[in-house]
Amino acid sequence: FRLDAARKVTAEGAADLVRELKEAKAQWLYLPPDSFLGTLAQDVIIPAAMEVGLPTFASTEQLMQAGALSGLVSRYHSVGQFTAHKVEQILLGKVAAETVPIETLKRFSYQIRISVAEKLKLPPPLPMFNYAEILNDAPIAQ
């Protein structure tokens, strides 16, 4: 993203940056976990990527809901349950917070949005149907 005159991040020119990536021969656009990106994904970033035929790979459920082609995501429900487990260890188990190990979830969901795959003419390889979660719907918020 670019900075404005006050040196704050701005969405201005974000679609142009996506086009520049495609012109520079990018094959995929990775969408990292970023709250500012999340606010722009559905209305700016993903439409710009679709316009130039650049597939998107999401890192969060929010970005998949915004319309990304595919992503390896942790379900927010699972993240909440895992967080509750950690809180329980600290508050009820009286474990000192600094001794609770840093861990990641052990299960992720590989998601593919079929409507986007069809538009980009990028059908998933058949073996992916054995483990991927296939999303047949449109993006959640319109």
Predicted features and spans:
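Short hydrophobic alpha-helices and adjacent helix-cap/hinge residues
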Residues: 1-142
